[in-house]
Regions:
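Conserved AdoMet
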Residues: 39-120
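Generic L/I/V-rich hydrophobic alpha-helical segments across diverse proteins
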Residues: 149, 172-179
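S-adenosylmethionine
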Residues: 236-396, 401
């Protein structure tokens, strides 16, 4: 195989083929995908765009940057650390070697926590956001027509032209109002409870292979107040910041023992526009938590890999911070600490939501029960593995629902 040199002419197609072979020789599991992801980052394009640029030649600067990326990946450095970012749900998060790389299965934790507050799925929220935006655009169009009409009539001295303009304005306003009605807005403020969406009456079809969408708990009743969220072991902040984006009436506290991780989470809070609703605390779980702090939701994806297993993990996973992986002899050390203190910091009616390791679901559920919480669901991930445990601090409002779930 020829070496990648800056003197040779390298097209997109040629360099992808070369890198795929090179990565295959290094034992990487997805050599072509890795090559495409790295090249896209260098060129600033999407993967699909590569197929339209196969004959494009790389500049010396692009080739130099790509070559450095390839060498790092060949040494099994995770892709996200090389590019410096990772997609989680619909947002890009900065990541560094100081934080665990966000993973797809963790998105389910966010989805279920959102349902706990809203009673709605992420799909429903996205649909409502779409129509809300359409309604706002329609309202702006109506206002623009009215403003333009007033200005025009004020300057118009010819009565016939004024009448003609009034008719044109009426026609424009009618068109704008029709658009507003289609967006769920007629007059006045939009009624969010009646926002329409495509196929509202259609039965939701669950793709094969996805986990059961049985809800983990009925919606929390916050009586119009702010929803308070605590994320223990926040890392990049992916869980908490996604929740803040999806729940505008919420605020959150991100806790991590690592100051480097908290720095990354703070950057991401600013990038996602939720820095005004996010606070950060360097603490070993509860050690520096104010005694009176109370939350509606406590979420955590703590270290859960048994210490003796870490050396057997994929080489790129071993590049992630040990602090975010090592869960002690049985992988449950962090869960014991979190559950031991959560009763004093979760409001009645509140939710505790955990991501867990393989085979840990029932053990973590038992730890929750020991603290007086009612386990409402152990949810499987996309691979059919028990991956999340949800527990509520019961009160009379939920007692009937909980009994029904336990039958």
């Amino acid at each position: 195989m020829i070496a990648m040199t800056e003197q040779a002419v390298w097209t997109v197609n040629k360099i992808l083929q070369w890198t795929q072979q090179y990565f295959s020789g290094k034992g990487l599991e997805t050599p072509r995908l890795d090559a495409e992801v790295l090249l896209c980052d260098v060129l600033g394009c999407r993967r699909i765009d590569l197929f339209m640029r196969l004959q494009q030649e790389l500049s010396p600067e692009e080739l130099k940057k790509y070559r450095s990326f390839v060498l790092r990946r060949a040494a099994w450095e995770p892709l996200a650390y090389i590019t410096g970012h990772k997609t989680f749900l619909q947002w890009e998060f900065n990541v560094t070697p100081a934080v665990l790389i966000p993973r797809p299965e963790t998105e389910l934790l966010v989805e279920k926590a959102v349902h706990f507050v809203t009673g709605k799925s992420l799909t429903q929220l996205e649909k409502e956001a779409f129509w809300r935006k359409k309604a706002e655009e329609a309202r702006a169009a109506v206002d623009k027509v009215k403003t333009l009409s007033a200005e025009k009539l004020q300057d118009e001295t010819d009565p016939e032209k004024a009448m003609a303009w009034q008719q044109e304005v009426a026609d424009r306003e009618a068109v704008a109002l029709q658009a507003a009605e289609r967006a769920g807005l007629v007059f006045g403020e939009p009624d969010e409870k009646k926002i329409p969406g495509p196929a509202d009456d259609a039965e939701e079809k669950k793709p094969q292979g996805l986990p059961d969408r049985k809800e983990v708990a009925p919606p929390v009743k916050t009586a119009g107040r702010t929803v308070d969220i605590l994320d223990i072991g926040t890392g990049s902040g992916a869980i908490l910041l996604s929740l803040l984006k999806l729940l505008p009436g919420s605020r959150g506290l991100a806790v991590d023992i690592s100051p480097e991780a908290l720095a990354v989470a703070k950057e991401n809070a600013s990038l996602l526009g939720v820095a005004d609703r996010a606070w950060f605390l360097q603490s070993d779980i509860w050690s520096r938590m104010p005694g009176k702090a109370q939350f509606d939701i406590v979420v955590s994806n703590p270290p859960y890999i048994p210490a003796e297993v870490i050396g057997t993990l994929e080489r790129d996973v071993q590049k992630e911070p040990r602090l975010a992986l090592d869960g002690g002899p049985d992988g449950l050390d962090a869960y014991r600490k979190i559950t031991a203190g959560m009763a004093g910091h979760i409001r009645p009616d509140g939710l505790a939501a955990f991501e867990v390791g393989i085979g840990q679901g029932e053990a973590v559920a038992a730890l929750c029960r020991e603290q007086g919480f009612t386990v409402t669901a152990v949810v499987k991930d996309y691979a059919g593995i028990d991956r999340m445990v949800f527990a509520v601090r019961p009160d009379s409002a939920k007692a009937g629902w909980v009994r029904q779930q336990q039958k």
